[in-house]
Amino acid sequence: MSSRFVDNESEFALWRVKRARVGDASRRVLIAHKDKSIGDSLAVQLRQKGLQVIHSQDLKSVRALVQSWQPQALLLDTSLDSDSGYVFLRTLRMDADVPGRLLVAMSNVWPADPVQTLKDAGFDAHCRRPCATWRIVDLVEAFFSTPFTR
């Protein structure tokens, strides 16, 4: 593996390619990010793509929204869950519906979440700040553009 690939993976990576399930007309994305401006910016861009989006800034609300609103994609600011060792995400991974849900880690530049730790926690993709929001928007749009059929 070249050092260039490793450098890129530490900034942006997609480890598991997923597609939204066919038959679910709603396309819901939950943005869980402490920084209001980042969350709002992503929300605007994703809504322009025709997606339903909610932005939440705390893990308690995120937990409730995951259960009640059942988003197909979750963009999670890792600082909301890293102190617990990603207990929220690991618990979410045990949910039977998770194979069809896109889980994206949005981490800060410092302290840096180790890429392997994010993979082990169960994230499908990773974007480290300062990550261009268009990369996340493209990733989410691709998830919804080619539905998964069973």
Model-found features: residue ranges?
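Two-component/phosphorelay signaling modules centered on CheY-like receiver
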Residues: 35-54
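Conserved phosphotransfer cores of two-component systems
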Residues: 67-69, 93-100, 121
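Acidic, metal-coordinating helix/loop segments flanking the phosphotransfer/catalytic sites
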Residues: 55-73
